[in-house]
């Protein structure tokens, strides 16, 4: 079962990305290192509710 998730920057809190994940394979919150346009650098983005 795939669900839509929103990824927010851990430094500024801005929600920059929308993605999908499989809840069966990844039951915990996912984290990706992605580019944040507000900070102008790659930062850690964490799944939000």
From Swiss-Prot:
Similarity section: Belongs to the bacterial ribosomal protein bL33 family.
The keyword Ribosomal protein is annotated on this UniProt entry: yes
Protein name (record): Large ribosomal subunit protein bL33A
Organism expressing this protein natively: Bacillus subtilis (strain 168)
Key words, A-Z: Ribonucleoprotein, Ribosomal protein
Gene that encodes it: rpmGA
Top-rank lineage group of the source organism: Bacteria
Lineage: Bacteria, Bacillati, Bacillota, Bacilli, Bacillales
GO terms for biological process, alphabetical: translation
Subunit details: Part of the 50S ribosomal subunit. Interacts with VmlR.
Matches recorded under InterPro entries: Ribosomal_bL33, Ribosomal_bL33_CS, Ribosomal_bL33_sf, Ribosomal_zn-bd
Residue ranges, annotated region (Disordered): 20-49
GO molecular function ontology, one term from the record: structural constituent of ribosome
């Amino acid at each position: 079962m795939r669900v839509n998730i929103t990824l927010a920057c851990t430094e500024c809190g801005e929600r920059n990305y929308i993605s999908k994940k499989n809840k069966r394979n990844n039951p915990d919150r996912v984290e990706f290192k992605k580019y944040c346009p507000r900070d102008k650098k790659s930062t850690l983005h964490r799944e939000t509710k």
